[in-house]
Design a protein with these regions (language model features):
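Active-site environment of divalent metal-dependent phosphoester hydrolases
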Residues: 33, 81-84, 105-107, 143-144, ...
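Conserved beta-strand hairpin/beta-sheet module of binuclear metal-dependent hydrolase folds
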Residues: 4-6, 12-64, 147-163, 180
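Active-site metal-binding motif and surrounding structural segment of the metallo-beta-lactamase
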Residues: 54-100, 179
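Active-site metal-binding loops of divalent metal-dependent hydrolases
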Residues: 29-30, 50-52, 79, 139-142, ...
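Metallo-beta-lactamase
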Residues: 101-156
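Cap/insert and terminal regions of metallo-dependent hydrolase folds
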Residues: 169-270
Length: 280
């Protein structure tokens, strides 16, 4: 049984606010068990991935005085459970549009019984939701058709790069010019190699081009993007066993220091709590 509504992506009606709200971005939680972030502009409120439980997403939005009922859409990077497990709870009663590409939608259709209002986009083609333009682009990862996002707003851009094995030149160019970047820093190479609980085959997958970013690779990517409009970095998707917030932040900060760059704010997202909100 097909429980999906398929509609072409189109601009959504604006949500009226009495006072203009500057663009704000918060990572609600990020890690191996679940990932979700929240972006709010003057007219639009978006959830980017829904990998936390529906209850946790609701609780963490409530901390900011928001609720799922006010969302204008949910953007999905890919179909893996740590990015989608909250969809069922959020969409069971609320008709929140879910934006994803065809292969991601196809995969979700086989796994979910909940009826979803899917707004299918074509990978590589931008679209609008309210007052934002969403650019999406392919990233290397072991999913059906994983993407990153560059969300353009009146106040600047927000880039989302989670779950990718390599920050290619093409990927970096797609987020160049953002004001804030949420980027994966999954593992410390030494800790992963010394981990006795993971089979070598799993380690190879993690370190592969379609796996996850090491701290050192993340640091190089951030250095590459640092000369320009970039002001805020949020490191995410840290491994519970092969990384720590301190190690990840130090790796990026040291790389920037060596390059003589000291103008960036670096935050690290965790599974347990939202990050401090970034205002563009």
């Amino acid at each position: 049984m097909n429980n999906f509504f398929f509609r072409p992506v189109a601009p959504q009606s604006a949500s009226p606010y009495s006072v203009r709200v500057p663009t704000r971005f918060t990572v609600l939680g990020s890690g191996s068990a679940g990932n979700a972030s929240f972006l709010e502009t003057d007219q639009t409120r978006l959830l980017i991935d829904a990998g936390l439980s529906g209850r946790q997403i609701r609780l963490r939005l409530a901390q900011m005085g928001r609720s799922p009922e006010t969302l204008d859409g949910i953007l999905l990077t890919h179909e893996h459970t740590d990015h989608t497990q909250g969809l069922k709870a959020l969409c069971a009663k609320l008709e929140i549009p879910v934006y994803c590409n065809r292969l991601t939608a196809d995969e979700l259709r086989f796994r979910m019984e909940t009826k979803l209002d899917v707004r299918q986009f074509v990978t590589g083609q931008s679209f609008e939701i309210g007052d934002v333009t969403v650019e999406n682009f392919s990233v290397p990862h072991d999913a059906q058709d994983p993407v990153g996002f560059h969300v353009r707003t009146a106040d600047g851009g927000v880039g989302v790069l989670t779950d990718l094995g390599q920050a290619t030149r093409l990927v970096l160019e797609r987020v160049r010019g953002v004001s804030a970047l949420f980027i994966e820093a999954n593992y410390d190479l030494n800790l992963l190699q010394e981990d006795t609980r993971r089979p070598w085959a799993i380690k190879q997958r993690i370190m592969s081009r379609h796996g996850h970013l090491a701290n050192s690779s993340t640091a190089e990517a951030v250095e590459n993007l640092a000369n320009g409009t970039l002001r805020n970095i949020v490191l995410g998707h840290l491994s519970r066993d092969c990384n720590t917030p301190e190690i990840a932040k130090e790796a990026v900060a040291e790389k920037l220091l060596q390059a003589g760059i000291d103008s960036l704010r670096i935050d690290v997202s965790t599974q347990a709590n939202p990050t401090e909100t970034i205002t563009l």
